[in-house]
């Protein structure tokens, strides 16, 4: 079987733990996830099964939505409360100041520096491993976009709840730091829940305990809304051998599905350049 599970990951469990438990529960050979969710965080994790593990890239580029709580005036090495507390401040803050800082990031594109404790690689090594070795490195920033950023509670006891919708590659821990910097203080993540990945919603996810085999979204169902190209038997043989396609065979300008004359799914084609497409996944 090849497809995807929408899983509601609990706090304290790693994304790897989720993969391991699903693999054990259903006796699958190949299982993977589409993007790490920190142990501190709960919420939506998309888990790939079988050949669909090769489709994780489709989810990586999708935007994400989170809700959670920021903590101010405390500096942790990991930028969340699970890390080591390095320093504290006693900067007086209020709702107006917090709201002003929130508004400055709403619908904003900026260059964000990932946390040192992250899986981003520097010269082939993951940064969290360098951090554990107390190595200081220059972290290259990445361009991110904050689609929506909303304060969801009154500021109280140095805490405030939030809702945020962000582009791929955005670290909410870094956003906590950057938000607080505008207030001349420290910021960290106290709580985080991922509620959406693209159009995939947490409300449609299940816990590992409640997950059933019929909850698997088959790869053919996932691609049902894609443009399709039905080819004759001769061209299907070429497709199965990895042949590229161009404007002579297709009229679409976006990724599509190739089917045979019986409308069986054969391959998913992605864009290589303006007039050329290549098979990125075979059913």
From Swiss-Prot:
* Active site (UniProt): 38
Source organism's superkingdom?
Bacteria
- Which Gene3D superfamilies does the protein's record reference? Pseudouridine synthase (3.30.2350.10)
Q: Which UniProt keywords apply?
A: Isomerase, tRNA processing
The record's EC number reads: 5.4.99.25
Database matches in CDD domains: PseudoU_synth_EcTruB
Entry-linked InterPro entries: PsdUridine_synth_cat_dom_sf, PsdUridine_synth_N, tRNA_psdUridine_synth_TruB
Gene Ontology biological process terms from the UniProt entry: mRNA pseudouridine synthesis; tRNA pseudouridine synthesis
Show the catalytic activity.
uridine(55) in tRNA = pseudouridine(55) in tRNA
For the protein in the UniProt heading, the enzyme class is isomerase
Annotated SUPFAM superfamilies: Pseudouridine synthase
Kindly list the GO molecular function terms attached to this UniProt entry.
RNA binding; tRNA pseudouridine(55) synthase activity
NCBIfam families recorded:
TruB
Q: Which family does it belong to?
A: Belongs to the pseudouridine synthase TruB family. Type 1 subfamily.
Task: Tell me, in a sentence or two, what this protein's role is.
Answer: Responsible for synthesis of pseudouridine from uracil-55 in the psi GC loop of transfer RNAs.
Name of the protein this chain belongs to: tRNA pseudouridine synthase B
């Amino acid at each position: 079987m090849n497809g995807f599970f929408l899983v509601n990951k609990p706090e304290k469990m790693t994304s790897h733990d989720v993969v391991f438990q699903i693999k054990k529960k259903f006796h699958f050979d190949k299982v993977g996830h589409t993007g790490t969710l920190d142990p501190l965080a709960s919420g939506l994790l998309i888990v790939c099964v079988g050949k669909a593990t090769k489709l994780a890239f489709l989810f990586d580029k999708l935007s994400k939505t989170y809700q959670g709580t920021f903590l101010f005036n405390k500096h942790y090495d990991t930028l969340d409360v699970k890390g080591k507390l390095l320093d504290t401040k006693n900067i007086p803050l209020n709702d107006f100041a917090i709201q002003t800082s929130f508004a400055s990031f709403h619908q904003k594109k900026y260059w964000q520096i990932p946390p040192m404790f992250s899986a981003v690689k520097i010269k082939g090594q993951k940064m969290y491993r360098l951090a554990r070795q107390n190595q200081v490195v220059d972290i290259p920033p990445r361009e991110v976009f904050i689609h929506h950023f909303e304060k969801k509670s009154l500021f109280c006891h140095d805490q405030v709840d939030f809702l945020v919708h962000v582009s791929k590659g955005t670290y909410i821990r870094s956003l906590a730091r950057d938000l607080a910097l505008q207030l001349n203080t420290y910021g960290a993540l106290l709580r985080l829940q991922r509620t959406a990945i693209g159009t995939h919603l947490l409300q449609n996810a299940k816990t590992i305990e409640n997950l059933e085999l019929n909850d698997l979204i088959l790869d053919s169902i996932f691609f049902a809304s894609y443009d399709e190209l039905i080819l004759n038997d001769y061209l299907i043989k070429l497709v199965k051998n990895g042949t590229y396609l161009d404007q002579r065979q297709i009229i679409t300008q976006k990724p599509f599905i190739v089917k045979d004359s019986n409308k069986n799914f054969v391959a998913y084609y992605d864009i290589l350049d303006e007039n050329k497409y290549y098979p990125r996944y075979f059913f």
